[in-house]
């Protein structure tokens, strides 16, 4: 009874779903996720009541006094149980196709089929979910939130309080990590704090302890992918049929766009002339799966990479040769740095003439800038792939206990939100009369270096040093209607918006100085903290002062909307992405066939960041993304028991990669070349694409397991490839299962 809780010392109030009604905190349009349970409990860990007390400790003590009576019902937990119960989102599976798959499969010289299961992943941001709400005058509410999406927090809090959005101000200074886990999962805390602050008239703060955070909040979607592929004797794909099964949890959250993006990346880097992709989005009694770095892309990409490995094994070919044989053709010379294409092109290009035009993805987007032929050739050379392939084979022939594996996998990742209207950003820039610059933009900083890159953009426009630029916390009262800092879009969108605002102010200053010194604006230059005009040399501060005294506005907003996008998700056709980011990774591993334990010995990565805004930051993202991706596919295992209780909800039971899990030799480099599209300084997004380099580790582990047998049985290693799964796969290879 709530009366027992309210009667405790320092407890101010207790709220239940019956009292507050359906207060929605879901990012989905269906509004199917109430803040507090209403009559039914849909998963173990679902919030039921809210305790308001004078301290965090007292609130937790009081909450332990609560008693809840349940009538247990059998949960739907597995993909098989959801299919049997027809428990799903949408009326049925989503199906996209091209060509005549059935006929092409029937005519194919070889048909291969299989199944791949991959687990979910906990975000494990170092700073947990947290929010602070402070009531203001006239019903206003100021919310400070650890969120990737301040505008969604603003919208949800305003809806919960029954006030317009202008009455709610949301501010985010920075986050201690996000990875997609703070795109929508912070809604509940912000709403709860705002309701408590409105009720008590006092500021209210809330944060999850690590165990609560892991039990309550969403994870990466786990998938099962069934495939049937027809190939010729050279390993070229003639037709492929994918079926994706997505375990979504109890509410929609972001499942539909995540599953869509998995379908959009089912081709990865490969031309699939006849393809069918069927996607089932299944409702289960677990915490709702949500956004996570890659947003479905890694799952879809892993499916086709498993197919390439399976083809190579079935035909007795080198997996890299099969991958290269199925690459999209190079329709035009890639717009890379001087000499790069000449040095690494040619022999590795497909036989089709370059003037045939671009091939298209299964959803109809032309692949016009495909650089993986040259990029992979360069990585083959720099990583000494061919010699190491021979060395690994020789090692495996001589060592019965420790087996090595080697794999090279490519990445082609689409950049843009698939919900087209989210591809926009705003910025606000002030230049003060002393030459200092105040900048605010709609992106959020979570350790990825967005503010550093945006400050560089502003400094380059005005020709000043970074010390002149101050970025203030992301604030819905300064830049409205922001999109989430997600989909690797932070630098692309906000960088362009900031550039537009800064150029407006710079051009005003240039016009004023040109008129004053009787010259043309084009002759006014900004560089190295100086402004040159009509033979005069001014400091930027002097130029700003002159403009101020000339009554020139030194404040401007900037806005950017990504061009060229047109996407119809119902038909599965259009151009959902502005461009593709590319890369490739080589991983070498060793496994102990007696225990299943394994190590990553060496990793070589070559990644396409376009004309990098900050190579040091981008290399950090590439290396960190690889480690996180490798963790998803090796050590990070989520385990639920038969009643739907998450058993891996603490660092003691859930293992993210540690220092000892990193490759012993780690070589990361950036591809030299500009983005052919008109992005900020011709750069490319680098947040999500490197995550998929971790796929090379699973493929290398599979290669090592295959070395334990006679080649007749495909390893069929599932993910995450824990020591237990590796050991079982080894035993199957040796006929001991």
Model-derived regions: residue spans:
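Flexible, low-hydrophobicity surface segments
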Residues: 1-92, 111, 344
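C-terminal catalytic domains of large/alpha subunits in multi-subunit enzymes
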Residues: 9, 17-20, 162-167, 197-204, ...
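Short acidic, glycine/serine/threonine-rich loops at helix termini
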Residues: 24-29, 62-65, 154-156, 179-185, ...
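Short glycine-rich loop/turn motifs
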Residues: 38, 127-132, 224, 405, ...
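Glycine-rich loop/linker segments at domain edges
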Residues: 93-131, 222-307, 414-424, 549-556, ...
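Conserved beta-alpha junction segments in alpha/beta enzyme cores
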Residues: 101-161, 260, 407-436, 441, ...
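Thiamine diphosphate
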Residues: 155, 178-201, 205-208, 450-458
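Hydrophobic "anchor" residues
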Residues: 237, 251, 437, 597-598, ...
